[in-house]
């Protein structure tokens, strides 16, 4: 059984036992999280959400992604600025899908 959930502005296909990387969620390690914005469960589409469906998971890790370099450059103006950014993420293990 699989489902498509909406979290962090993205749609993610999940199955029980999967570990997914999503946008940062507030919470400590080993805390249970529930996703109630379920768009599809086992072939049944919602409009826009499936009524009564929810996906439950556990927070496994809080971390930051790889560093990216952002450059601000203006030619002939002697302006050259380099910024760094690391996007925070949460790793969640999907425990069960309820339809």
Swiss-Prot record:
One of its GO terms (biological process) is translation. GO terms for molecular function: rRNA binding; structural constituent of ribosome. PROSITE patterns: RIBOSOMAL_L21 (PS01169). It comes from the Bacteria. Pfam families: Ribosomal_L21p (PF00829). GO terms for cellular component: cytoplasm; ribonucleoprotein complex; ribosome. InterPro entries: bL21-like, bL21-like_sf, Ribosomal_bL21, Ribosomal_bL21_CS. Keywords: Ribonucleoprotein, Ribosomal protein, RNA-binding, rRNA-binding. Belongs to the bacterial ribosomal protein bL21 family. Part of the 50S ribosomal subunit. Contacts protein L20. This protein binds to 23S rRNA in the presence of protein L20. This is Large ribosomal subunit protein bL21. It comes from Mesoplasma florum (strain ATCC 33453 / NBRC 100688 / NCTC 11704 / L1). The gene is rplU.
